[in-house]
């Protein structure tokens, strides 16, 4: 069986769709998948054993990238086409069955998928390889608990202050000597945040994973205790690796993109998402100031995340 998946360009949405892929993999174990996907998200499937082809497509002017996609997929007989981008591509290709998913508002994204496909889409996954797992084993110790920290993001308004992250880490360490922090994100986020988030913190308490691949990051998450970070693709990766999480929300929609995993928590600003929709957002400033360090630390204690 051959399945064509037209995936999102976004890392987060791609990760949230893996429950669908998981279902079809289990139902049809011999299936070979072809993924049409953006360059930033393509590595999510690099270790996926059922992948046949990954077609990486970058956006072009006047939507000319769709011609590239058609040329790569045309002339083949697809058993199933799964389109997460609500495109017209399937109408140009031979297929036996198709699913064209369109996002809606005011319902968790994974629940939207489950409602559309009429099966449980919550079993997310991201596969890691032996080399990635051996690196984790080499660097992590059973003597410590590891918190994954993501202080960055692709949109300034939803990024909590790096000074607050630093204060939170210091507060956690003051009461918990057996915790270490794994800092994740891109190389540019390393340049922007590393020095300030680690200020006055013993370097032995920090594992700098900025710039690591998505799958290497996932391998570390699989061996960690907790994720704390801004609304992002990496917060969804925490769900895919079954890592409990505390995700911070302000001018983004926690109803749709909040973690659905049991024992994970949403902490949002005093202002609701509807409030942020009603104002003009200044893209150069953060709107997360009403979330206090104390509020997050209280959530840690209340849910026994440090134990």
Tell me the role of every PLM-derived stretch:
Residues 1-307:
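Catalytic machinery of carbohydrate-active enzymes
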């Amino acid at each position: 069986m051959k399945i064509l998946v037209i995936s999102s360009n976004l890392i987060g949405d791609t990760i949230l769709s893996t429950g669908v892929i998981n279902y079809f993999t289990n139902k049809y174990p011999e299936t070979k998948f072809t993924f049409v996907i953006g360059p930033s998200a393509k590595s999510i499937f690099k270790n996926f054993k059922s992948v046949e082809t990954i077609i990486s497509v970058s956006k072009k002017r006047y939507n000319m990238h769709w011609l590239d996609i058609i040329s790569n997929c045309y002339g083949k007989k697809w058993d199933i086409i799964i389109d997460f981008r609500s495109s017209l591509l399937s109408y140009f290709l031979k297929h036996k069955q198709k699913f064209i998913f369109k996002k809606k508002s005011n319902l968790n994204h994974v629940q939207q998928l489950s409602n559309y496909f009429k099966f449980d889409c919550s079993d997310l996954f991201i596969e890691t390889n032996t080399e990635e797992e051996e690196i984790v084993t080499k660097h992590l110790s059973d003597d410590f608990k590891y918190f994954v920290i993501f202080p960055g993001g692709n949109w300034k308004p939803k990024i909590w202050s790096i000074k607050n992250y630093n204060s939170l880490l210091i507060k956690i360490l003051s009461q918990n000597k057996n915790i270490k922090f794994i800092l994740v994100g891109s190389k540019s986020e390393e340049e922007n945040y590393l020095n300030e988030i680690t200020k006055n913190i013993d370097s032995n308490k920090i594992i700098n994973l900025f710039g690591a691949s998505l799958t290497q990051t996932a391998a570390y998450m699989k061996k960690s205790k907790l994720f704390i970070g801004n609304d992002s693709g990496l917060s969804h990766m925490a769900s895919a690796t079954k890592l409990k999480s505390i995700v911070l929300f302000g001018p983004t929609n926690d109803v749709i993109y909040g973690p659905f995993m049991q024992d994970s928590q949403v902490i949002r600003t005093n202002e609701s998402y509807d409030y942020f929709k009603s104002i003009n957002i200044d893209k150069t400033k953060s709107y997360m100031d009403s979330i206090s360090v104390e509020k997050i630390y209280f959530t840690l204690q209340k849910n026994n995340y440090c134990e």
